[in-house]
Amino acid sequence: VIDSLTLSLQQREAQQLVEPTGWARVDRNIDKIVQALANAKNEEDYQAVGLLCREAIISLAQAVYDPNLHPSLDEVNPSKTDAKRMLEDYIATQLLGGSNESLRKYVKDAYQLTVTLQHKRNANFRETALCVEATRSLVNAIAIISGQRDPYIDF
């Protein structure tokens, strides 16, 4: 029963439509993540999914971060793979003010959940599926914040 439930969840996850962000590398990463989760069978497979989630977040940060527009919060210039700093600087600039505190917290928490789950050496399907969902949530939140999800209006 548990195996059939797990298989059903994996297949449903793989079948869910993923709305493209318009960032080609991010979209390719998300597609790979969904397929890898659907095919994962053991701890090493689940860890590999976590690594793909990490790569997707780095690609996401690289897609939105511009050092000229998003000054460093801690006066440390992020490296090309420092997704945490890039995203923190990005959301601090894009979501200014006290009224956006809960939105900033949501993005930070989604990032932290993804990072925490992807480092579990004994990961299982459920934890990995949560990591995937946290990654997708983070990608979609940043896509919305950046305007990538705005409806197209033809005048």
Give the role of each language-model region.
Residues 35-42, 65, 69, 119-123, ...:
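Short, flexible helix-adjacent loops and helix caps
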Residues 75-150:
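Long, charged low-complexity segments
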Residues 27, 31-34, 45-66, 135-136:
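Short, hydrophobic, well-ordered secondary-structure elements
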Residues 17-24, 40-51, 101, 105, ...:
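Short, solvent-exposed segments of well-ordered alpha helices
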Residues 1-28, 32:
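Internal, Lys/Arg-enriched amphipathic helical interaction segments that engage polyanionic partners
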Residues 62-79:
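Surface-exposed interaction patch
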Residues 28-39, 110-120:
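Solvent-exposed, amphipathic alpha-helical segments
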